[in-house]
Amino acid sequence: MIEKKESTISTEDAFLVGVVFGNLSSSKVSEHLEELELLAKTAGANVVHRYTQKLNRINPSFFIGPGKAQLIIEQAKSLDVKLIIFDDELSPAQIKNFSNLSNSIKVIDRSSLILEIFSQHAKTKEAKTQVELAQLEYMLPRLTRAWTHLERQMGGIGTRAGAGETQIEVDRRLVRTRISNLKKELDKIDKERETQRKNRKENYKVALAGYT
């Protein structure tokens, strides 16, 4: 049986990154980082440093320039931080490029952080299923070595590599399978809710008939 992965943010020391670009002023980015810090704390992270970078253009490889990317990785290492959170949304390629700079430091963005918070606060079976589905659909195109070895978190049938499969291919297969199963589970929940609604309606009609 495949189980939902545990939180990878809770109790981590975090390094926040904000970018001054376009119409965004330094003060506005500072406000965004204040919000991001609150979100990180809500997820259980301990923010130890905030970094702001002014850009004339977005770098397609790292969002910020490659030199600055290496710099924040080195700063994070010096602070013994394993989690860097960007206020801006990163592309799958940018996530992959950061993972190539360091396997020991995980780089995520605001969207991933918010999904983590939703996951922690989901109470009902349906809410937990919806959040896990959203997390995995977000993760799939961004899957890199930083996300690998999912069999430790999602153990069960189908975790072994087939002929010629790399570990990351196994991980992607695991995620796709889990996404498919979660969608089926949500369909089942919807059908059960509809059946319950119809039953309540019929019971109401029967009860009403008893009074007439």
Predicted features along the sequence, with ranges:
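N-terminal accessory targeting/assembly segments
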Residues: 1-114
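Conserved G1/Walker A P-loop phosphate-binding module
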Residues: 5-14, 24, 146-212
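Short hinge/gating elements
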Residues: 18-23, 57-61, 115-122, 157-172
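Conserved hydrophobic/aromatic pocket- or pore-lining residues that grip, position, or stack substrates
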Residues: 84, 136, 175
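Short alpha-helix plus adjacent loop in nuclease-associated cores
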Residues: 112-133
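A charged, well-structured terminal subsegment
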Residues: 133, 137-151
